[in-house]
C-alpha cells in the first residue's frame, strides 16, 4: 500500500443537453469504457472515479464543491467529449481548490472515412469543445494542466500519471507538518525564511521542538527494541569490524539505533513527515543523528540539516511525487569541486545524511568514524556511492516577495577513484551545461547550498510542481546561456512584481 491508495481522481465529462438523450447516453457509455480501461491498463498511480455528466452550471458547480470537501479527492480530470459551453463552468471553477487536468482526447482514434456523418461529428467534438474550455481557463487565469492524446496512448498515460503524482503530493503538502529539532544554524541566511508565508503558499506548517523533548523519548527506548533494530542492520548492511558484535564501536551503533527509534516515535506521535536537525543544538544526544536520518529518509521522511525547513519540506514533497518510481531521492549538498578542463565535476555529500535510496550498492557499509563537528561521540553512518545516469538537484528559496524553485539537470557519473578516507555517502556528477555556467547561474539566482537530489524525478516533474503551486522556476540545463538566464531572472522580477 502506498500514499496513492489514500486518494482518487475524479473523471468529469463535459457536455450539454442540446444534443439529446441518445447522444448523452453514448457519451456516458464512452466515459465508462475509457475510465475502466485507464484503471485497468494505464498503470496510473491513483484510481479514476467517474462522476455524473456535467451538463449544466448547477451540476458542474456541485461536482466542484463536492471535490473540495472530499478528502480522498486529489483532483479532477475533465474531458470535453462534446461541446460544453464554458460559461456553465465559471461558478464551479471559481470555487474549485483541487488540481485540474484537461484530457484533450476523443473516443475514436481514427476517423471513419467512409461512414462519418453529422451524428458522428456532433458526438465527438473534443477538438473544439476543448478549446472552449481552454478559453474560460485562460479568461479566469485558472491554472490547469492539459494532456492531448488518445486515451489508449501510453505517452498520454504517462503524462496523466505524472500529473496525478503532483495532485496527490499537493494534498499531502497541505497536511505536512515539519518538525525542527532546535533552531536555524546560527547566522546562516538561506536556511531561514518566512514560515507563515510558506504555510499560506504551500500549506505545510513548520514548528520548533526542543531537543530535550526528543531526548526524553530517545532515553525511553528499551533494549529489546534496540536489539531488534540491530538485527535489521545486520541483515541490511555490511558492518565494518569496528561495528560488529565484538567491535570497539558496537556501542555507538546501539546508541544510533536508540536515536533512530526515538526519533521515529517522536515523529509518529506528532504526525510529522519532515524534520530538521542542527549540530549546534544536540544537547542530550550522544551523537549527531546520521544513520537514523538516513534510514528515516529512505522511509519517506523529508529532512535537511542546519534547520533548513524549506529543503526538508521539499524532500518530503518529492518523496511523495516519486513513490513507486525507479531511482531514489535524497537530501544533498554541493560539497567540493574537481576542476579538469572538459571534465569538471561536483562531489555532493553532507556530514552524514544522504539517503540510501540513491545507493548503487545493494548493501551499503555501516561504519562508525570520528566527526570533527558538533563535539559529540563518533556517529554511525551508511557509506555508499550513487547510481549513475540523469538526475536533478532542486532548491526552494524564499525571496521575500515570492518563492523560487531552482533546478539544475545533472549527469551522475562513477567515481573514477576509490575514496578510502572519505567516511560518508557521496554522489559525483557533471552539471549541465557545464560547471562554470551552472554554478554561476545558480549563484546569480540565489540557489541554496542544500538541495534535493533525485534520479526518480526529472525537469518536467519540477515544472509541473512549480505550476501547480504557482511559483517561479529557474532552470539550468543544456540549453542554458548566462545572458538569457540573467534576462529571464530580470523578467521574472517584473512579472511577479506586477502579480503581487
Swiss-Prot record:
Provide the cofactor note recorded for this chain's UniProt entry: Binds 1 Mn(2+) ion per subunit.
The UniProt entry, under Gene3D superfamilies, shows:
3.40.50.10940
EC number from the UniProt entry? 5.3.1.4
Matches recorded under InterPro entries: Ara_Isoase_C, AraA_central, AraA_N, AraA_N_sf, Fuc/Ara_isomerase_C, Fucose_isomerase_N/cen_sf, Lara_isomerase
Q: Where does Mn(2+) bind?
A: 306, 333, 350, 450
Q: How is it modified after translation?
A: The N-terminus is probably modified.
Cross-referenced Pfam families, in alphabetical order? AraA_central, AraA_N, Arabinose_Iso_C
Enzyme class, UniProt record, top EC level: isomerase
A GO cellular component annotated for this chain's UniProt record is: cytosol
Which biological process annotations from GO are given for this protein? Answer: L-arabinose catabolic process to xylulose 5-phosphate
Q: Which reaction does it catalyse?
A: beta-L-arabinopyranose = L-ribulose
Q: Does the keyword Manganese apply?
A: yes
Q: What does this protein do?
A: Catalyzes the conversion of L-arabinose to L-ribulose.
Identify its protein family: Belongs to the arabinose isomerase family.
Name it.
L-arabinose isomerase
Origin species, per record, is: Salmonella typhimurium (strain LT2 / SGSC1412 / ATCC 700720)
Taxonomically, what lineage is the organism?
Answer: Bacteria, Pseudomonadati, Pseudomonadota, Gammaproteobacteria, Enterobacterales
The gene that this protein is the product of is: araA
Amino acid at each position: 500500500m502506498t500514499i496513492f491508495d489514500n486518494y482518487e481522481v475524479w473523471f468529469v465529462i463535459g457536455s450539454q443537453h442540446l444534443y439529446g438523450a441518445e447522444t448523452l447516453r453514448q457519451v456516458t457509455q464512452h466515459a465508462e469504457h475509457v475510465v475502466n480501461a485507464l484503471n485497468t491498463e494505464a498503470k496510473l498511480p491513483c484510481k479514476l472515479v467517474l462522476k455524473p455528466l456535467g451538463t449544466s452550471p448547477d451540476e458542474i458547480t456541485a461536482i466542484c464543491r463536492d471535490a473540495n470537501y472530499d478528502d480522498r479527492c486529489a483532483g479532477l480530470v475533465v474531458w470535453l467529449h462534446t461541446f460544453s459551453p464554458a460559461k456553465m463552468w465559471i461558478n464551479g471553477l471559481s470555487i474549485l481548490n483541487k488540481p485540474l487536468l484537461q484530457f484533450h482526447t476523443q473516443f475514436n482514434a481514427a476517423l471513419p472515412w467512409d461512414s462519418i456523418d453529422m451524428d458522428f461529428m456532433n458526438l465527438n467534438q473534443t477538438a473544439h469543445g476543448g478549446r472552449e474550455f481552454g478559453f474560460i481557463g485562460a479568461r479566469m487565469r485558472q491554472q490547469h494542466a492539459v494532456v492531448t492524446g488518445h486515451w489508449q496512448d501510453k505517452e498520454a498515460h504517462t503524462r496523466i500519471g505524472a500529473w496525478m503524482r503532483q495532485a496527490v503530493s499537493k494534498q499531502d503538502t497541505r497536511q505536512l507538518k515539519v518538525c525542527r529539532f532546535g533552531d536555524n544554524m546560527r547566522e546562516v541566511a538561506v536556511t531561514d525564511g518566512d514560515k507563515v508565508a510558506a504555510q499560506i503558499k504551500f500549506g505545510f506548517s513548520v514548528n520548533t521542538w526542543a531537543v530535550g523533548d526528543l531526548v526524553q523519548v530517545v532515553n525511553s527506548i528499551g533494549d529489546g527494541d534496540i536489539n531488534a533494530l540491530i538485527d535489521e542492520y545486520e541483515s541490511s548492511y555490511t558492518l565494518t569490524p569496528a561495528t560488529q558484535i565484538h567491535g570497539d564501536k558496537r556501542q555507538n551503533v546501539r546508541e544510533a539505533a536508540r536515536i533512530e527509534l526515538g526519533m521515529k516515535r517522536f515523529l509518529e506521535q506528532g504526525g510529522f513527515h519532515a524534520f530538521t536537525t542542527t549540530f549546534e543544538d544536540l544537547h542530550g544526544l550522544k551523537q549527531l543523528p546520521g544513520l537514523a536520518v538516513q534510514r528515516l529518509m529512505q522511509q519517506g521522511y523529508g529532512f535537511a540539516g542546519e534547520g533548513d525547513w524549506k529543503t526538508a519540506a521539499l524532500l518530503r514533497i518529492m518523496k511523495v511525487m516519486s513513490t513507486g518510481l525507479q531511482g531514489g531521492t535524497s537530501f544533498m549538498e554541493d560539497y567540493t569541486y574537481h576542476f579538469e578542463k572538459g571534465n569538471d565535476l561536483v562531489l555532493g555529500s553532507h556530514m552524514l545524511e544522504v539517503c540510501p535510496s540513491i545507493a548503487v550498492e545493494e548493501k551499503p557499509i555501516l561504519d562508525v568514524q570520528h566527526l570533527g563537528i558538533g563535539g559529540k561521540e563518533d556517529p554511525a553512518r551508511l557509506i555508499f556511492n550513487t547510481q549513475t545516469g540523469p538526475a536533478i538537484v532542486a532548491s526552494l528559496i524564499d525571496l521575500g516577495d515570492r518563492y523560487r524553485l531552482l533546478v539544475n539537470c545533472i549527469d551522475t557519473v562513477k567515481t573514477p577513484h576509490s575514496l578510502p578516507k572519505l567516511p560518508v555517502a557521496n554522489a559525483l556528477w557533471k552539471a549541465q551545461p557545464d560547471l562554470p555556467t551552472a554554478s554561476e547561474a545558480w549563484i546569480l539566482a540565489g540557489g541554496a547550498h542544500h538541495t534535493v537530489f533525485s534520479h526518480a524525478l526529472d525537469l518536467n516533474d519540477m515544472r509541473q510542481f512549480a505550476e501547480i503551486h504557482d511559483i517561479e522556476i529557474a532552470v539550468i540545463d543544456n540549453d542554458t546561456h548566462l545572458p538569457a538566464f540573467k534576462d529571464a531572472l530580470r523578467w521574472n522580477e517584473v512579472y511577479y512584481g506586477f502579480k503581487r
